[in-house]
Amino acid sequence: MIETKNLTKTFDNFTAVDSLDLKIETGEFFGLLGPNGAGKTTTISLLSTLLLPTKGEILIDGQKLTRNRPDLKRKISVITQEYSMRQDMNMDEIMEYQGRLYFMPRKEIKRRTEELLEFCDLIKFRKRTVRKLSGGMKRKLMVCRALLTDPEILLLDEPTAGMDALSRRQMW
């Protein structure tokens, strides 16, 4: 379960997220809807600790989430709007790097990488560097990377943007 209490984020004089109280139960699907600039991406960045709140708190299974809680951070994975991957690395290297960040055994990283790249129809492109991938392929790789650690909480910020219709359908 993930819960926020009075979650607020300000940037100078602009309040992007204002006193958000939210409770999402285990197994529940939840969407943030709103126009551009409504604070959806900022909220996701706060929930994943990419940003720190100005005030308020985030609880994972009743425990306060901070950047100093790797045990709780391991439960969360995020797919951001931006292609946040090193452009000079290939797919295998991206997946290896992600797995090592979470102290996964190499054998498990290799097994999950194979499984996920196959699932997303990327296996034959695995040695291409990120800079040589299409937008849709980058997006699929971000999905693979996010699922690698088998997270309990998956935060998605426009995960199928840039994908063709068939890829979007496969993803959902």
Regions found by a protein language model. Name each.
Residues 143:
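Hydrophobic anchor residue at the start of the ABC signature
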Residues 154-157:
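Catalytic Walker B motif of ABC-type/P-loop ATPase nucleotide-binding domains
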Residues 150:
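Conserved catalytic motifs of ABC-family nucleotide-binding domains
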Residues 96, 100, 107-125:
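Conserved ABC ATPase "signature" region
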Residues 129-133:
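Conserved ABC ATPase signature
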Residues 56-67, 71-72:
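Conserved ABC transporter NBD signature motif
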